């Protein structure tokens, strides 16, 4: 890949989706390799200051070690959306990821989700993430503060991950963050003249 990337001026880069510890990220992110790696440390952390601070420090150190820019990811299709995760009870970072997966696996019934608190923390997290140096990767719907849909019945799941574990029901999959975006068509569009950029109400 690097040979192809270097044919461009400036050289192109790709982003590795490698769920590895921060001390191994430079192996994928260096300018001699792909150029960047998704930093999933935020996706594994609860809304605890010291845990978030550690994720930032490790992300910056990893970027410096690789000679690449830092990357920041709050959510993706492999973890419940952070607007929901941050509304669950707080636990140490080592078990937060598992708590969120258990909550999803049991249709959102094992722990009470505080949607209002989760939404506030999600907004604060995105603002923090956007203030950090490097590249921010925003998963579809994050910009709207969408929560995870945890109560999709097993017989309606479409993710292959769920199909592969439906008998044991050990992995619900990624459908809860892939539901259609919410839409209300009751209000008419706000353009008087769609060809005039100043024709808004």
Predicted regions and their residues:
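Active-site and adjacent substrate-binding regions of carbohydrate-active enzymes
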Residues: 1-201
């Amino acid at each position: 890949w690097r040979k192809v990337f270097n044919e461009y001026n400036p050289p192109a880069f790709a982003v590795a989706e490698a769920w590895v510890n921060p001390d191994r990220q430079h192996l994928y992110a260096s300018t001699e390799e792909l150029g960047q790696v998704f930093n999933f440390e935020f996706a594994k952390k609860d809304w605890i200051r010291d845990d978030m601070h550690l994720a930032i420090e490790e992300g910056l150190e990893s970027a410096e070690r690789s000679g690449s820019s830092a990357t920041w990811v709050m959510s993706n299709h492999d973890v419940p959306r952070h607007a929901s995760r941050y509304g669950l009870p707080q636990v140490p970072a080592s078990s937060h990821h598992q708590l969120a997966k258990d909550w999803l696996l049991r249709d959102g019934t094992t722990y009470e989700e505080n949607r209002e608190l989760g939404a506030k923390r999600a907004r604060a997290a995105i603002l923090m993430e956007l203030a950090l140096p490097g590249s921010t990767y925003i998963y579809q719907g994050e910009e709207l503060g969408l929560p995870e849909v945890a109560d999709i019945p097993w017989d309606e799941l479409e993710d292959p991950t769920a199909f592969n574990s439906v008998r044991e029901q050990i992995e619900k999959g990624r459908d809860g963050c892939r539901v259609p975006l919410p839409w209300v068509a009751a209000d008419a569009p706000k353009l008087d003249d769609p060809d005039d950029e100043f024709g808004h109400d």
